[in-house]
A protein has these predicted regions:
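Conserved helicase motor core of SF1/SF2 NTP-dependent helicases
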Residues: 1-68, 72-131, 135-162
């Protein structure tokens, strides 16, 4: 639309394609949300954490994960139950903020997209997920509340250490 209506306007798609916040694993996942855009490359250095990247956390391991990494819990709506003893906010309210670790309570459309990224996530769900994913400086984790556990391509299941 913008290119059509403003014929003399040039769109800069190179200046903002570097992230100083996120490690490459997080950039790679975020890039898949907008495949027609120039991919973002990481220049971020997450520090000396051993827990860098993107993970899947089984719902019965959430308490252990919260204790281990103290992530900010990100959810789509205040109606989603979370552990009130840890920081929590809605996806949209996190925009512009940086957090070490985030734990995302995914909606059904988000979980479906994670399992099969060949179909675009629609509208606000895509924008909100992009914001949620890109808040993390070190790690992003998604809660898997399925009974049998799901397998998601290129996202390992986090296993608590004994």
């Amino acid at each position: 639309y913008v290119k059509e209506k403003c014929k003399t306007l040039e769109i800069d798609d190179t200046t903002l394609n570097v992230s100083y916040r996120n490690p490459q694993q997080i950039c790679d996942l975020a890039n898949q949300l907008y495949p027609d855009m120039t991919p973002c490359q990481s220049k971020g250095i997450p520090g000396n954490s051993q827990h860098i990247g993107v993970y899947l956390v089984k719902s019965n391991d959430v308490e252990t994960y919260l204790k281990a990494y103290n992530p900010v819990q990100l959810r789509d709506s205040v109606r989603k139950a979370v552990n009130p003893e840890y920081s929590v906010m809605n996806y949209g309210n996190s925009k512009g903020l940086t957090m070490e670790h985030v734990l995302i309570y995914p909606t059904k459309p988000i979980m479906s997209w994670l399992k099969d990224r060949s179909k675009a996530l629609e509208g606000q769900s895509r924008a909100k997920l992009y914001v949620a994913i890109t808040r993390a400086r070190v790690s992003v984790a998604f809660i898997d509340d399925s009974k049998r556990g799901c397998k998601i391509p290129d996202i390992p299941v986090w296993v608590p250490s004994e």
